Swiss-Prot record:
Alphabetized UniProt keyword annotations: Cytoplasm, Exonuclease, Hydrolase, Nuclease
InterPro entries found in the cross-reference section: Exonuc_VII_S, Exonuc_VII_ssu_sf
Domain of life of the organism encoding this protein: Bacteria
Protein name: Exodeoxyribonuclease 7 small subunit
Record Gene3D superfamilies: Exonuclease VII, small subunit (1.10.287.1040)
Biological process, per Gene Ontology: DNA catabolic process
One Gene Ontology MF term: exodeoxyribonuclease VII activity
Amino acid sequence: MSKTKTFEENLQDLETIVNKLENGDVPLEEAISEFQKGMLLSKELQKTLQAAEKTLVKVMQADGTEVDMDD
């Protein structure tokens, strides 16, 4: 059973992929595969950040209703 990785773990994985690709000593097939993994990680990280932003822009009023902070 695999556990879901945290935002920080996914970010570290993405940084590892970027560093590997920046070094340039990766065979083409592996570079393409790593690039695809990196793109998937990037999308997942973006979704996590967007969800966090939605949570942070709302505040609870005393009566329990939510108010958008960007109004």
